[in-house]
Regions:
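Accessory, usually C-terminal, subdomains that scaffold auxiliary metal cofactors
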Residues: 198-203
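Extended amphipathic alpha-helical segments with heptad-repeat/coiled-coil character used for oligomerization
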Residues: 204-213
Length: 213
């Protein structure tokens, strides 16, 4: 039987890292690094990728607009009993979460800021494979299917509130795969073409059904 080569560590770049889902993922990643067996039995997919990705090599970074600390966010959301995560406070304090791009910036400038953040994350976690996880809130239907290129897309994004798209453009053009956990549609033709061009996958849709709508 052909042996399976273990992959590099995984770096989850979470847009919305201090939300209820993002902060819980941060705790889980911290727990996996120290107490793997406390977490794995509760994951339905635990055995599916065990030979590919060591569970204790999953790291978290990302962005959020909240000025609260990640620890305060975990505490406020009350998803996890405090006894479960207090042992990982020091680990949570080490998780690097960047500020979101300032809203007065043009869409292109916001993307450039995020691209710079991604470069810095890669330097911080040398050898890890980054993946963007979109946990931003639902923003309603935004039709961008008529945009023919990134320039058109940037122009259109000037008049709509769709921050997910800036993160997606930054990730795809940086060679970073995208997992969309929100109900917002990211797979517009321009983005699909860029993903093909940069050879990166985009997957997922609406992992928070019941919360976003």
């Amino acid at each position: 039987m052909k042996s399976v080569q273990k992959s590099s560590p995984l770096l989850l770049l979470i847009a919305g890292a201090k939300g209820a889902v993002g902060s819980t993922v941060a705790v889980a990643a911290s727990a996996l690094q120290k107490d793997t067996e406390k977490v794995l039995p509760n994951l339905t997919t635990a055995d599916m990728f065990a030979e590919v990705l060591p569970a204790n090599q999953i790291f978290v970074a990302g962005w959020d607009s909240s000025d609260k600390s990640l620890i305060d966010s975990v505490l406020d959301h009350e998803v996890l009993n405090e006894k479960i995560w207090t042992g990982y406070k020091n680990d949570l304090e080490q998780i690097h979460i960047q500020e979101v791009p300032e809203s007065h910036l043009t869409p292109k400038a916001q993307v450039e800021k995020l691209q710079d953040d991604i470069r810095n994350f890669k330097k911080r976690y040398i050898g890890a494979k980054p993946v963007l996880i979109n946990l931003l809130p639902a923003c309603g239907d935004v039709d961008l299917s008529h945009c023919n290129n990134l320039s058109d897309l940037y122009d259109e994004l000037k008049s709509v509130a769709f921050p997910d798209m800036m993160y997606t453009i930054a990730a795809v053009t940086s060679g970073v795969p995208v997992v969309n956990f929100s109900s917002n549609s990211l797979e517009v033709p321009v983005i699909v073409n860029e993903a093909i061009k940069h050879n990166v996958p985009i997957s997922g849709k609406d992992g928070k059904t019941g919360q976003t709508y």
